[in-house]
Amino acid sequence: RDIATSLFVVKALRKKGKKARLLFSWDEFDRLRKVPKNVQEINNDMEKYIGYPYVDVPNPFHDEAQSYAEYFEHEFMRSIDEFGIELDYRYQAQMYRSGKYSEQIIHALKKRGEIFDILDSFRTQDAQPGEREAYYPVSIYCPCCKRDTTKITSLSDDCTQATYTCECGHEGSFDFTKDFNCKLAWKVDWPMRWMYEGVDFEPGGKDHAAPGGS
């Protein structure tokens, strides 16, 4: 439905002589949160990849796809091709890891207090003491264990340099102008992409307007 809704909007705009493109973004840089039952049945060793970005999780289905993410991307694209729908794809792992969002990430870090206040205004529970000061709208993927189980411990005044620790025991520093293996939290990532791509329309469901939704 999401694609169909956007497709009709694009067609209507083009019919009126407007330039319009239909973007489709692969959230392949999100973390693997759990292993679906059908995947577990194929490979019962997949839980060790929880916390990895989807693009770095091995493909358990034994076909030509290079990753867990790519397998489902291929499945989806084959289906879309059958309908003759042309999509302008964005691969978020490539976008992040190429540094294209570096400026936007630093901007979000500079505005982290304001972002926290906006998010906090929709919460049903009061923030804990020190929670605002410890809030960072970005997760760093650990270079040792490859997971996002990291915690930023300090940030430079210009918001370009950070130190962090990981649950695996690794400690390190991160330069947001040179190191790009990090990802914004989804409630910040989503509007960031709108700004970066100049998005004017995106469909949403009632779940997005629910308490705690986007």
Question: For the regions a protein language model found, what residue spans apply to each?
Answer:
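Short coil/turn segments at secondary-structure boundaries
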Residues: 118-124
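N-terminal Rossmann-like or analogous alpha/beta NTP/dinucleotide-binding catalytic cores
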Residues: 1-116
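Alpha-helical recognition segments enriched in aromatics with Gly/Pro capping
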Residues: 111-114, 125-214
